[in-house]
Amino acid sequence: DLHLSIRRQRQMCIRDSVGTATAANQVIYEYQKKGLIEKVKRDFYVVISMETKQPVLSRYQIGSNLFPDACITHHSAFEVFGYGSQVFYECYVATDKRFHDFEYDGVLYRHIERKPDMEVVQQGKIRVTSMEQTVVDSIRDFEKIAGIEEVIRCMMLVPGLNEQKVLECLARNNNGFLYQKCGYFFEEMQEEFHFSAKFFETCENGSSDAKRYLMKESQDNVFHKRWKLYAPVSLKGLIDKGVDAYDAMG
């Protein structure tokens, strides 16, 4: 029965039940009343631990199970891999399904558009963007998510990246400005990642011809001719200067 199913599968979310819809709704109601399950969102329930009175699923497990194609992305993906400089009370979920941002158990679940051919890996019971995909996505969207300083800090915690996979992510995005940004970021972080000259040549070839600004209202901007980019003299220097996490634009 449903109760036994819950007890045997403590790491599973309850989406559907057995029997008629009426019977299923009644069972769910009874389990909610007893505090055995909680509603996360419509048609999505999570088992509650009798010992801790907390959901048995982590925020990342919940997020990656919201829909069949859902996966954890951006700063939340850094957190899954253990490279989050800070823990946010937000969980970024990429999916083709539309949903309104919602809060459950003190965490705000935010919808992110799932890009075609996004590279997804399985980390335990969590579907999450690969480390390379996470870094490229975070560089692309730092003005919307986390801010440039936090992205830099997270990247500095990453022990290494596969440069070919980074290039594959860039090719899938097919965005000249993103090539400029990534060329600049990885050149500034060459000490950490040791990418080859071929990587930077590919970024140069993919870059837009337009001169762009990495950040707004920065007094430290200089023109980086190779990337046609107005950006700080030192990217890592931003950490010491304490740039506001959201005072940036892409």
Positions of predicted regions on the chain:
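Short gly/ser-rich loop at a beta-strand->alpha-helix junction or flexible surface loop bordering the NTP-binding
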Residues: 29-118, 226-229
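Hydrophobic alpha-helical interaction segments
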Residues: 120-250
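N-terminal alpha-helical segment
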Residues: 6, 55-56, 131
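Short amphipathic alpha-helical interaction segments
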Residues: 19-30
